[in-house]
């Protein structure tokens, strides 16, 4: 994915920072996967592991951002190289926030287990669907970056709409349960917080896809409609 330069050290610097970012992405994706497994099975120990690993992601964000700054100062890159470094600096911020959302899911899971909630008490199929979709989007967004594949980003944008629909479907389910049983209100609010975190993960995965388009085409596609974004990704 890196264009060759006269300086082999410059190539090595760019490849190194890209590899670090992808490693951070791998860890973040693992965090989300583990957080969803903990939530789906109401596993407090698994949730605790997610919370313990959060600091590793925070440290990586700081280290990678510093490395991007160092390369810009030393090499004064232009054109796509500069866009790449600027995008990585923003991508790691989104990845760190995905890690924060995974931690929120873990915290909600711990509260649910402490309250004695059981996985079978309510229909969580929409939540599981949204979680699986968010993990898939995150994986594909990282793959599209690695291969600078803008065409793959179009489906990621469409899938974000699917997550939003699943979120609203789950909220309707929660409201029904809480109306029927007021003792479910506290549990329902924790599930709502977890669902909102999943929705936000989908948003961050979409941001990652947008940065791939920016690197390749130099077009800032933030704040445009999903239809326009998908069209830009495919042209």
Curated annotation (Swiss-Prot):
GO molecular function, one term: protein homodimerization activity
One Pfam family this sequence matches: PhoU
Domain of life of the native organism: Bacteria
Protein's job: Plays a role in the regulation of phosphate uptake.
A cellular component annotation (GO) from this entry: cytoplasm
Name of the featured protein: Phosphate-specific transport system accessory protein PhoU homolog
Phylogenetic placement of the source organism: Bacteria, Pseudomonadati, Pseudomonadota, Betaproteobacteria, Burkholderiales
Family as reported in the entry's similarity comment: Belongs to the PhoU family.
Keywords (A to Z) from UniProt: Cytoplasm, Phosphate transport, Transport
